[in-house]
From Swiss-Prot:
Species per Swiss-Prot/TrEMBL record: Homo sapiens
Record's keyword annotation contains Methyltransferase: no
Protein name listed in UniProt: Tumor protein 63
Positions of region (Disordered): 123-171, 351-393, 435-472
Domain SAM: 541-607
Length: 680
């Protein structure tokens, strides 16, 4: 700040208590701002709290925040007399708001402002002797959130429990995680062998089986590799794979081992291996820290042992199993996943050859049957293979067919379709019918809104066509091109009348591959969008949205609250789009999820409130348009802080002018000396 030069001497000192009370008036600030101010005012190391490191920690926690600073300057000056003393108080405040730009993260409701402030309070207490008055007030009501700075004391401290049914879908992840095997022998004497055709491992019990781990980019520090067995078939997948009682209780392979006797998979030659049993699901797995490949190699080798036969009664009992190998961070986040089938047997080479021959015969038989629809004799020659007999053809539901696919991306897409069709068989028929009815109601509801928007009164006939064409040239902002929610908010109100007829389905639900079952044979897909471009950049079409309660809660990361809605007969978002916070509280929804659901309802309302094009195209973010109930949406990752500077300047006249202001120091000293002598 700039100060006027004065011939008066300047003295700076700490302000009086009434000034401190004025600054800390709680009515002017939120409790989070008061928290920052009380912490900084009580600390003996104020510079540490005002240093850029504290705000950098918050900045890093929000990854890529939207930061806005609003400076506030206040000046209080007593009216000075001519050449007299003055008392000047200057307060400079910076109101800082940092908000995460990615509000679609399903985990963001768990990282509340209160949880972050509690973690910062712990860091501040560790670095200074100051304490906050909010520690005791909010200790019991605070939402527990992990500290963004704290690191686990051990590699395996923060591992999250595995789901009830682990995923068996291959996922290379951001590091191109892959699992492979060395060139194996098919001889009967081989202790292990791997079939790339069947994607299946054959090995003997308690024999070393090397597995090669490969990544294209190094994973984060402290990454681990987990190996977990699961049953392959759907009727057994919920059971935990363990050793049979015979091998578990025998002394063979158990004496002198650190691994629990019930674990099927063991790691050999790694003293850092840790055997984990999930306390909720009971699934057993073994973890080893990830080690980068040695010089001259591109693989990291892990030696695994399988401690029970697939045919053991009381254990696997001839049920096929899958081995899921995942690359995870120290807090349990999956960075990559690979899966393969395993069979533990006495003669791996023999069993592999038998399985491969059987599958080849099955493929030849299927291709022959599909090539000619007429019945063929039981004895025939096909490609040089003598078919002495053909078994009775299975029913279409039990028949296994194999489709060779070129390219992993195509394979994973077909695999998702296959899994979706299989899961469809487990749904009851009334659930399917309800879903189709919801889709039809949603389709009709959006069509009605579309019709009301395209009415002539909505556009008005006073504006000339040239003005309408100019509105088409207005381009959306970058945030609207990136944010899918605002992309859905683009409506036909920004399109001229001449072009509105060509896009009757704008803003409606476009059926995807998963919605084909909801269309009757008489219904047709919406016509393709035809939008003649009048500029070099055309806004993208809106994304299709699923307005069911299940999808709505899944997008918010609140899937656990589904029962609170379904028990009341609420199945679509349109049934709760007018709900308030009191309505959500009446449903007995937990408070930590209530704010997130309320924020999602507000966003849904915003998407269906068709405003003028200028509002849609000039809005910098969705957060600025949601003003209703802003005090109730504190669950988002938004941090408000106030950084202030208080300076009080008192100016005194020169010493030779003190007599004019009855401020003679020599006279006061003489008076005090006389009082002292009289007292003696």
């Amino acid at each position: 700040m700039n100060f006027e030069t004065s011939r008066c001497a300047t003295l700076q000192y700490c302000p009086d208590p009434y000034i401190q009370r004025f600054v800390e008036t709680p009515a002017h600030f939120s409790w989070k701002e008061s928290y920052y101010r009380s912490t900084m005012s009580q600390s003996t190391q104020t510079n540490e709290f005002l240093s850029p490191e504290v705000f950098q920690h918050i900045w890093d926690f929000l990854e890529q925040p939207i930061c806005s600073v609003q400076p506030i300057d206040l000046n209080f000056v007593d009216e000075p007399s001519e050449d007299g003393a003055t008392n000047k108080i200057e307060i400079s405040m910076d109101c800082i708001r940092m908000q995460d730009s990615d509000l679609s993260d399903p985990m963001w409701p768990q990282y509340t402002n209160l949880g972050l402030l509690n973690s910062m309070d712990q860091q501040i207490q560790n670095g200074s002797s100051s304490t906050s008055p909010y520690n005791t007030d909010h200790a019991q009501n605070s939402v527990t959130a992990p500290s963004p700075y704290a690191q686990p004391s051990s590699t395996f401290d923060a591992l999250s429990p595995s789901p009830a049914i682990p995923s068996n879908t291959d996922y290379p992840g951001p590091h191109s995680f892959d699992v492979s095997f060395q060139q194996s022998s098919t001889a009967k004497s081989a202790t292990w062998t791997y079939s790339t055709e069947l994607k299946k491992l054959y090995c003997q019990i308690a024999k070393t089986c090397p597995i090669q781990i490969k990544v294209m980019t190094p994973p984060p520090q402290g990454a681990v590799i987990r190996a977990m067995p699961v049953y392959k078939k759907a009727e057994h997948v919920t059971e935990v794979v363990k050793r049979c009682p015979n091998h578990e209780l025998s002394r063979e392979f158990n004496e002198g081992q650190i691994a629990p006797p019930s674990h099927l998979i063991r790691v050999e030659g790694n003293s850092h291996a840790q055997y984990v049993e999930d306390p909720i699901t009971g699934r057993q797995s073994v973890l080893v820290p990830y080690e980068p490949p040695q010089v001259g190699t591109e693989f990291t080798t892990v030696l695994y042992n399988f401690m029970c036969n697939s045919s053991c009664v009381g254990g696997m009992n001839r049920r096929p199993i899958l081995i899921i190998v995942t690359l995870e961070t120290r807090d349990g986040q999956v960075l990559g996943r690979r899966c393969f089938e395993a069979r533990i047997c006495a003669c791996p080479g023999r069993d592999r050859k038998a399985d491969e021959d059987s599958i080849r015969k099955q493929q030849v038989s299927d291709s022959t049957k599909n090539g000619d629809g007429t019945k063929r004799p039981f004895r025939q020659n096909t490609h040089g293979i003598q078919m002495t007999s053909i078994k009775k053809r299975r029913s279409p539901d039990d028949e296994l067919l194999y489709l060779p696919v070129r390219g992993r991306e195509t394979y994973e897409m077909l695999l998702k379709i296959k899994e979706s069709l299989e899961l469809m068989q487990y749904l009851p028929q009334h659930t399917i019918e309800t879903y189709r009815q919801q889709q039809q109601q949603q389709h009709q509801h959006l069509l009605q809104k579309q019709t009301s928007i395209q009415s002539p009164s909505s556009y008005g006939n006073s504006s000339p066509p040239l003005n309408k064409m100019n509105s088409m040239n207005k381009l959306p902002s970058v945030s609207q091109l990136i944010n899918p929610q605002q992309r859905n908010a683009l409506t036909p109100t920004t399109i001229p009348d001449g072009m509105g007829a060509n896009i009757p389905m704008m803003g409606t639900h476009m059926p995807m591959a998963g919605d084909m079952n909801g269309l009757s044979p008489t219904q047709a897909l919406p016509p393709p969008l035809s939008m003649p471009s009048t500029s070099h950049c055309t806004p993208p079409p809106p994304y299709p949205t699923d307005c069911s309660i299940v999808s709505f809660l899944a997008r918010l990361g609140c899937s656990s609250c589904l029962d609170y809605f379904t028990t009341q007969g609420l199945t679509t978002i349109y049934q709760i789009e007018h709900y308030s916070m009191d309505d959500l509280a009446s449903l007995k929804i937990p408070e930590q999820f209530r704010h997130a659901i309320w924020k999602g309802i507000l966003d849904h309302r915003q998407l269906h409130e068709f405003s003028s094009p200028s509002h849609l195209l000039r809005t910098p973010s969705s957060a600025s348009t949601v003003s209703v109930g802003s005090s109730e949406t504190r669950g988002e990752r938004v941090i408000d802080a106030v950084r202030f500077t208080l300076r009080q300047t008192i100016s005194f006249p020169p010493r030779d002018e003190w007599n004019d202001f009855n401020f003679d120091m020599d006279a006061r000293r003489n008076k005090q000396q006389r009082i002292k002598e009289e007292g003696e």
